[in-house]
Regions:
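Short glycine/serine-rich loop/turn segments
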Residues: 72-214, 366-386
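Serine-dependent amide/ester hydrolase catalytic core
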Residues: 11-14, 57, 311-403, 458-461
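Short helix-loop capping/hinge segments that flank enzyme active sites or metal/cofactor-binding pockets
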Residues: 72-95, 251-253, 300-355, 367, ...
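Immediate post-signal peptide segment of exported/extracytoplasmic ligand-binding proteins
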Residues: 59-76, 246-255
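Short, well-ordered beta-strand elements within core beta-sheets of diverse protein domains
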Residues: 11-18, 97-101, 213-220, 329-335, ...
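Acyltransferase
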Residues: 20-28, 57-60, 266-287, 311-316, ...
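Structural helix-boundary/capping segments
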Residues: 36, 115, 165-260, 274, ...
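An N-terminal boundary/leader segment
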Residues: 1-53, 64, 455-462
Length: 462
């Protein structure tokens, strides 16, 4: 049986604005699904039941009085426990932040969604301090993949991806520093976006790497994702892309990223990308020779800024941290400033190299992750013929593109049932800043042609 939550976000909001559907009905359905499924998935760190019901009642009162509640009227959502929610402690997934001073205001992005009538259902699990790709949390536990609960949801926004994939909420928000939206979106078989730098406000979001951090939404269709993205974006990002960027009268020029972006991909992941290119009749393959160095630069910047941010508390109470995160932060405190400076300088050089590619191509395509979701009990991946920890290595294809500062969609490949384990495979679709309209238009075309699309895991389709 299909849940009412599975309808497009715009349709749900329109029905609530017209009075055809009550916000209370929608929120109650979300709460029921959270109660039924969160125990097996561990998406939520807090469920704000009374607050959500009160907000739904207010939306219904506004509609009864003829007031338009907004573009997202009555639609439930949830946010990564990295975003300030007024009256709550922002834990950032950390035990040592439980009981910290409650936020005086909502994060700007949370407030933007509420201003358009969306209803916050709760906060979502994550890797501690957003430092990892697995959402295995020493205090809050592991978030599990709805397609196979023995497997990872990915991270660090794993709760955000799992909750949407299982249909607990129609959309959610997370953060992406080095791939923390794209990795879990890919592993959970839904849509996500890492926006261009400064496209979405970061006020009220706990930082990891200030010059790499971004906020990105998750959804189960390109239409839903674009709608939420438009609400979250700064006004300057809402403008229609100009004609020269869209190139409306010309074919979209597509290239696949080779080299680093195929070297460690499993056969099934690489086959998905190659099949997509073949279906598009796109043959161009380009390499970014400095991609591996770009990944190293992102690692250095993350370690150095993370270590500096946490130095005081690490000195006073190191045992209060998740051991896996503590070790990485401590290593970051020892990164020489000269090495950090080189990484920052390299970032500017790398961006110029990527910009040159977009002189010849409109869209670049690459895998999201090197493999499908690893097991929770064996969170490892094979990199250069070595078994390595997924916590640090699931983002080998997302980290270099993060450094470039470009907008990137994570889209779920539709697999052939006869040849697959049915675990999702995510594909990155990237463009240059200012071409976001083209990015969404291209993704919608793929979705309409049946090449990409999210599919609710069968056990949650009720």
């Amino acid at each position: 049986m299909v849940s009412i939550l599975d309808q497009p976000v715009a349709n749900l909001a329109a029905k609530i604005r017209s009075g055809e559907l009550l916000a209370m009905t929608l929120v109650s359905e979300s709460l029921n699904r959270i109660r039924f499924h969160n125990g097996s998935l561990n998406c939520f760190t807090r469920v704000l039941e009374s607050e959500a019901l009160s907000a739904a009642a207010e939306i219904d009162r506004q509609v009864a009085r003829g007031i338009n509640p907004g573009l997202l009227a009555g639609v439930p959502f949830a946010c990564k426990d990295l975003f300030d929610v007024k009256g709550l402690s922002t834990t950032a997934g950390a035990k040592n932040r439980i009981g910290s001073e409650p936020a005086a205001h909502d994060a700007e992005v949370v407030q933007k969604l509420k201003n358009e009538g969306a209803i916050l259902m709760g906060t979502l699990n994550m890797d501690e301090y957003a430092y990892g790709f697995v959402t295995i949390n020493a205090h809050f536990g592991a978030t599990r993949n709805p397609h196979d609960t023995e497997r990872l949801a990915g991270g660090s926004s794993g709760g955000s991806a799992s909750a949407v994939s299982a249909g607990l909420v129609p959309f959610s928000i997370g953060s992406d520093t080095n791939g923390s939206v794209r990795v879990p979106a890919g592993l959970c078989g839904i849509f996500g976006i890492r926006p261009a730098e400064n496209a979405i406000p970061m006020q009220g979001v706990f930082p990891l790497v200030k010059n790499l951090d971004t906020v990105g939404p998750f959804a189960r269709s390109t239409d839903d994702l674009e709608l939420v993205y438009r609400v979250l974006s700064h006004p300057s990002s809402l403008k229609t892309t100009n004609t020269s960027n869209v190139r409306k009268d010309l074919p979209i020029r597509v290239a696949r990223l080779g080299g680093w972006f195929e070297r460690n991909a499993t056969d099934e992941v690489l086959d998905a990308v190659l099949t997509l290119m073949a279906r598009l009749d796109a043959k161009a393959v380009v390499e970014i020779p400095e991609a591996e160095a770009a990944r190293s630069a992102s690692i250095i910047m993350t370690a150095a800024q993370g270590g500096a941010l946490h130095l005081d508390l690490l000195s006073k109470d190191p045992m209060s941290y998740d051991p896996a995160v503590r070790d990485r932060l401590l290593a970051g405190t020892m990164v020489p400033f000269s090495l950090y400076s080189q990484a920052v300088q390299f970032r500017e050089y790398f961006r110029k190299q990527v910009a040159k590619l977009f002189e010849s191509f409109d869209i670049l395509i690459a895998p999201c992750t090197p493999c499908v979701a690893p097991l929770v009990e064996d969170p490892t991946v094979w990199i250069d013929v070595k078994k390595t920890l997924a916590r640090a290595s699931l983002g080998i294809f997302t980290q270099p593109l993060s450094i470039a500062g470009i907008p990137i969609l994570s889209v779920p490949w539709i697999r052939e049932p006869a040849n697959s384990t049915q675990l999702p495979i995510g594909i990155q679709i990237a463009t240059w800043p200012g071409r976001e309209d083209l990015l969404f238009t291209f993704a919608k075309r793929l979705e309409q042609d049946g090449l990409i699309g999210s599919c609710c895991p069968i056990q949650y389709d009720h």
